[in-house]
Amino acid sequence: MFAFCKDNVTIGIIRVIAIFVRICYICCMTTYIKSPFPYAGCKYPLLEELDKEIPAGDTLVDMFGGSGVVGINMAYKFNHVIYNDIMEPLVFMHKNMYLDPLDTVLQKARDLSSKIPEKYAELRNAYNNLIEEVKLMHYHDTDERWKEVGYRFFGLMLSCTNNLVRFNRKGGFNQTCGKRQLTDPKVAEITLWKQKLDEIAPKMQFFSQSFEAFDGLPDGTVVYADPPYSNTEAGYNGGWTVDSDARLAKFILEHMNHKWVFSSCAKDGSTTKLVDTLVACGGFTERRIDYSYKASKKTKESKIEEIILVSK
């Protein structure tokens, strides 16, 4: 374990950090486990507010799972948790951390992460070539090549600029190399995340499907929906458009037998047609929360208003 550490002192530091964070999590109800991957749109800053709105139940579906912080931190309320995201590499990255031993995950982190631009570019090219192959050949999701896709994406997420996912128009990963390296605190974050996944493993399922594939959920299922933003052209939104918003609004309104918790950000007070449609139907209570968000040390802090809708 921790074979890549230089000496026992480093090992001790990592363990102390992980234990300290774990104690904080157990002892303080307002402390939540942070994802080691600050994925764009991550709802970690809002977990305390979302915790107030997401009711306990049998099954939680995190329909647009992203970083996974909502489903994993809310798992204590449910017997079953479904993580779903349309982006397959992201799902397989999470599945690898869920299925593989901690030693394997950390060794992969050591082998694949790099702040050396040439090594990073080599990994990025290898990832883009492999993802193109598995999609072209329609490999089954149990194929080992999908597992490797997940780990290569893992390495890119650890190393890319600000951990922000960016794709070109052909779907290739094109974010630049960052200046981060695999620090002891980052290893501790990965360790804590993995330990939490191990704890809730019997509850977890992972899918990469369109939201429309969840047509047959049992009555009373709690569904958390934080879709990509159609009002952005960012490369991480997976081609989500205003038409996608319209389809999701229709799906939600046709499935009000579920308990919906919906969130979306509003910059400068603007909302999407999706939010307006749900509010207009009269079937949701609405909360607006102001919070600050900073994507990186170099970016200015932005004031964002988060809209939370909860079905009545």
Where are these regions (language model features)?
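SAM-dependent nucleic-acid methyltransferase catalytic core
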Residues: 14-44, 102-224, 228-234
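Conserved alpha-helix/loop element of class I SAM-dependent methyltransferases that forms part
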Residues: 42-56
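Short, solvent-exposed loop/turn segments at secondary-structure junctions
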Residues: 44, 67-70, 87-90, 159-162, ...
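SAM cofactor-binding core of SAM-dependent methyltransferases
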Residues: 59-125
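A short helix-to-beta-strand connector/capping loop
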Residues: 79, 198-204, 282-284
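Long, positively charged, glycine-interspersed low-complexity recognition regions
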Residues: 241-312
